[in-house]
Amino acid sequence: MFLLTQMDVYMSKKFFKLNNTTKTLGKIFPALLICTPAVAFSAIIDQSTSVPQDFSADAEYVINQDVTISSADSEAAVSVSGFKVNNATNNGNISGTGNGLNINTGVQSVVINNGIGATISSTTANAVNIKSLRGDFNNSGSIIGAENGMFVSKGSSALNITNTSNGMIKGKTGLSTQAGIGINNYGSIIGTNGDAITADYGNTKVINSCTVQGTDNGISSKDTANLDILNSGTISGETNAIMFASSEINTLLLDTGSTLIGDVISTNSKGNTLTLIGTGTEDSNFIGLNEGDGFASVTMNGESWALSGNIDIIGSGDSLLVETGALTLAGDVSNTGNTRVAKDASLQLGDGEKTATLSGGLTNNGTVIFNQGSDFTFATDMTGSGNVEKVDSNTLTLTGKNSYTGDTVLHGGTTLVSTGATLGVKGSNATVTVKNGATFATAGEVNNNIAVLSGGTLAAWNAVQGNSTLSASGVDTINGNVTNGGTLLLSAADNSVGNNFTINGDYTGSDGSQIVMNSTLGEDNSPTDHLTITGSSFGQSGVSITNIGGAGAQTINGMEIVSIGGSSEAQLTLAKPVVAGAWEYNLYQHSDGNWYLESKATPSDDPSDDTDDGGNTDDGGNTDNGGNTDDGGNTDDGGNTDNGGNTDDGGNTDNGGNTDNGGNTDNGGNTDNGGNTDNGGNTDNGGNTDNGGNTDNGGNTDNGGNNAPEVMAPEVGAYLGNYLAAQGMFLHKRDDRDQITFRNEDDLNTWMYVKGRYHENDAGGDKVSYDTTTTVLQVGSDFMSKPMDNGILRAGGMFGAGQAKTHSDAKHNVRDAQGKVDGFNVGLYATWQEDQKLRLGSYVDTWAAYSWYNNKVTSNRNDEDYDSEGFAASVEVGHAWVIQSENERTWKIEPQAQVIYSYLDQENHTDRDGVRVTTLDNDSVFGRLGVKASYFQQKDVKAWQPYVAVNWLKGAGQNDLALNDETVSNDTPEDRGQLELGVTGNLNETTTISLRASGEWGENSYAAYGGHILLNHRW
């Protein structure tokens, strides 16, 4: 603490100087006053001056309140230097035209104080310029510099800067250090035209509990700085909150009260880390500047944190660690390593509004919670001993190998285990609990027990809206016990019939539970959903049957809907009457323990073990009187085989009650009139095989099912034409927008083109044909021209609009249909050209565009509207050279190659008749390989240039659509040939016009013809 001794001073021409007597008294008298043997060498300044001051001779200096020391020239107003000074305090004002305060002390420990209300300022340089300081700098006042508020050179060491709650440090850069120091900020550090704090070298530690604010970055590290930040205050930057750009390891520790305004960027170092303690929320991104950049690790050691921004984690091993507390992530988290959740800790993905993504592995020994804001596919493999919960109402699709051994609780929404995915370990006793409002379905491998609570649903895969019927192994299979207190839903959402749900374990139903199925009510072998229980059944459940197109028929043994491998103790009852026309069906349990739908008032006898009156075994439950074995459960006395319980005219009695008129095999309760095989409840009138419920009147094979329709709806062609037109509407090459024959280095190009295209094609296996006419207007302009060491780079923007009209006809159908697409797009392009003047040498052209479309399909059946949107990007290369010739004109040859990626997302559409139109894939890749030959005048390159181009077009794009799961292709050939003829010339000194005609040809009667007009204006 400074001793406040009054000293006399006198003015010289340049400095305040203390006389020798005053100096001696100032050094000795305070010690005498406090009765100690110590001697304090101190100087107190109590008068203002415009003369720069040098603090070097005494141990302590104090500038009193209301005292101003200023300097009008480049010399610092106050300089603290030498090896004697131990303490200097400013309670007044230090103002310099150059630096305000210069500090250059020795190896001794020095304390510099800027008191409450005190000011240190500079109008042209640094307010505080520290060349060398070992010790502490405490600021409770204002430090305001034109350049830096405070600047610390490399010569400083073991320096700690404390900015108290009353302190403010401000400059273009608030505080800049080239040495490793400590910064404790309880006040404000402000960068008015740059960073608030920047560290270039050394190990710097920043503890911020108040405000750090920059117009560029809040805090940044550069060069070889090692920057450690502990933040419980606010760090903000108009560009980024924090920029870690040094090559050394930087750390960020966020504590309770932390607020970041702007992102945290990591680059150049692979070892930067983020740690969370206490509680808090952040919406900033913690990401890398370039691909491969990011944070080596993110560690949660706090109580509760929510991060809603994106995070790039580039470490290996356990690089995302949740050691304690609850961590919520609601952005895209890219993790090249593994995520580990410790016991008693939790990781939540999504915050109920935003959806999080997480890549890498996941070891869960605590709890993982899904609370996503939208439908979400989770591909990360989950291991460990922890539990998983889903609390949102959206759809979660698991596609990974999930071998965690804990329990799973589903509070809401839909959870899907997709084909190839795994949930649980074989032999595990873990349980998936499906609560009220939640649905669970699997097409993969589920090795857990399932507990369906009241209001919950265990569903077949295709019972979930949007899922298609799958035939892969493991679909609709549970390898564990099922306890059903809610609904076991087997009926497909699309009203199809034939699901087979398998429980490789026991089934227990409780009061109020239901099993819901679809059936086509008919004879014994009619299609139906089916439940297979390989274990035993207990309890009770209601069975709800929905008839799908069944006309009803008399059953013999019944339609089996539930089979049980073990003890069959469950009581199943119909939840509602089951009626098909005049036929009513009951649910009976046979002696084999299985359950059957039967159109009978009483159940059938045991169908597998009946008595034959002739002392023979009869497998069909019939009496046979001739002592012979009949495979359908009947005895045929005339030596004929009769498989269906029928009377055979060879003189044998068969109790199946059917007539068979002559040496024929008849498999079940049918009339067969002549030497034909009839396999199921059909009338067959002459020499034909009929396998499934159809009437066949002559010479044809009818297998009970339909192939692709012989007569196709013309709307199919309209949908196909619309999709193909939208996919290709705005795809273009460089020559479509730039045909300038001569160009100066600084010329920019404004352009516009109009193109028309007529395209016709057979599709759907030649069952539908359509033609499409497309017109496109595209406008754009360069906004940048940058000469390079080799060539020139130009870039620009573009926008456009287009319309496509399709007319579709179908064979054997008098109707037709029309399609229409109105499209719009915006995009950017860039071109590097080796020789811009004559467009010689190599070039690279790229563009990217976003497009959106309004689509219509009209016919005499329906008018349909639907939307789509897409993105496309292109890379094109070429190289042009001139064939040397002595003639006035010669040829310029230009081989070209182009690859285009197209993404078109068409909303799934269901028309008014229930026809569902869906796309199978959204991604397409197109290729072009060709050569262009231009015939130009050597002495006047601006003269008109005719040209010809030949191209090989590769890729048909995504040209398949599914209509009610029936895939139809537009049959666009994968390989097509293209011929272009055109001419380019100047309308005036700055305007060029290009005219082109083109044709394309390929398989499947594919043909396309087009015209193109381009105007280029250079300026």
Features from the language model and the residues they span:
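Outer membrane beta-barrel translocator domains of Type V secretion systems
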Residues: 70, 93, 700-885, 997-998, ...
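Extracellular beta-solenoid/beta-roll
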Residues: 230, 235, 239, 268-352, ...
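Beta-strand-rich solenoid/repeat architectures in extracellular/passenger domains
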Residues: 41-47, 59-75, 89-98, 113-124, ...
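Outer membrane beta-barrel transmembrane domains
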Residues: 787, 824-827, 912, 916-1019
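Glycine-rich beta-solenoid repeat tracts in large extracellular/virion proteins
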Residues: 50-60, 75-83, 99-106, 125-132, ...
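Outer-membrane translocation/initiation segment of Type V secreted surface proteins
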Residues: 2-4, 13, 46, 52, ...
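Outer-membrane beta-barrel strand-turn architecture
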Residues: 744, 785-789, 834-838, 881-887, ...
